[in-house]
Design a protein with these regions (language model features):
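Positively charged n-region of N-terminal signal peptides that target proteins for export
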Residues: 1-4
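Bacterial N-terminal signal peptides
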Residues: 6-14
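Carbohydrate-active catalytic/glycan-binding domains of CAZyme proteins
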Residues: 18-341
């Protein structure tokens, strides 16, 4: 009861003031970001290069494998590029794939997050060593690869690329987590060091910190979000001097199938929240969904939100969906534009 009341207090105190639009109200649907014939497409993480081109690192796998378990068994991370944020995006090369060997990342390189630190590009991803486990399995881990070029080659951090696994301390909140650690969100702290956010037990968001880019990453013993219903797929950034974490809202803290923008003063305690994005229908209208084809999931919603920041401000949102709203035979990722007004 105490936990439920504290969550309710957070949500009631953190809705935008009267007359102030939520983060979710600023998004405008543009269209498809990546559609690849013969492939399902999922998490699509953007980065801007020095020439103004936008690169997307995209989880994809052959269409003959269903979304689940295809993402666990056959996902790879492909690199696409466009002259601007709205595309069209062109395939360049496969950046990472499962090793196929007896390693922690034998299968399913998935849900990338791309960043730049100094003169190096940092590609975070998840993978597993046995796709026959149940959905959202305990053998998920987080890896890191680095390169001085967005076209690679990519060198795995440390001995084998793995930078985070579930804790071995039984007092930690996600000890023996049924879903491992997954879906990384990365932030270079303005005072030095690095923050690695992740989803784990109970659909809560956790945090691991490191002094050096390649680690070691040390997990905090408590979750950083206060939620009694699952969230996931965080994207971390700093805006107006505050730490922000954009996640999905799986079961309706605000609206089931929408998103949440969490806010924190220190990046550790996310005690304020507001709607981060809405269901797809809110941006395209019901009529545009009449030909939508379901490939995964229940609601027609966005998944794995990833932001493109320009001059430190969110400008574009890239997100896949279990539904192809245009009726195609595989999933695609979509792009939305942020309107400041």
């Amino acid at each position: 009861m105490k936990t439920s009341l504290s969550i309710l207090t957070v949500l009631l105190n953190c809705l935008p003031a009267a007359g102030v639009e939520s983060f979710a109200a600023h998004w405008e649907f543009v269209g498809v970001a990546v559609s690849e014939p013969g492939y399902h497409v999922w998490g699509s993480s953007p980065i801007l290069d020095a020439e103004g081109k936008v690169h997307l690192f995209v989880a994809r796998w052959p269409r003959q494998y269903r979304v689940d378990p295809g993402w666990r068994s056959h996902s790879e991370i492909a690199h696409y590029v466009a002259d601007g944020p709205e595309g069209p995006f062109r395939f360049c090369e496969v950046a990472l794939a499962g090793t196929g060997r007896d390693t922690w990342d034998k299968y399913g390189a998935h849900n990338p997050a791309i960043h730049k630190v100094g003169d190096r590009y940092v590609l975070l991803y998840i993978a597993n060593d046995d796709p026959r486990r149940p959905a959202h399995p305990a053998n998920q881990r987080i890896g890191m690869a680095l390169s001085t070029s967005l076209h690679g080659p990519w060198r795995k951090a440390g001995a084998d690329g793995m930078i985070l696994a579930p804790p071995s301390d039984s007092k930690y909140w996600n000890y023996r987590a049924s879903n491992g650690v997954n879906n990384p969100a990365f932030l270079q702290h303005p005072d030095g060091g690095f923050f690695l956010y992740f989803k784990s037990q109970g659909g809560k968001m956790g945090l691991a910190v490191a002094q050096q880019l390649e680690g070691p990453y040390v997990q905090l013993p408590f979750p950083v979000t206060r939620n009694d219903r699952a969230v996931e797929d965080g994207y971390a950034f700093i805006m107006d001097g505050k730490f922000r974490l954009l996640t999905t809202d799986n079961h309706g803290l605000f609206k089931a199938g929408g998103g949440i923008l969490w806010t924190s003063d220190d990046g550790i305690h996310f005690d304020r929240a507001e709607p981060g994005f809405d269901l797809i229908e809110a941006y395209v209208g019901k009529e545009k969904l009449k030909n939508a084809v379901r490939h995964y999931g229940g609601k027609i919603k966005f998944e794995r939100p990833q932001l493109l920041l320009i001059d430190g401000r969110p400008k574009y949102l890239y997100a896949p969906s279990g539904y192809n709203i245009f009726g195609g035979d595989s999933t695609v990722s979509y792009v939305l534009r942020f309107n400041e007004q």
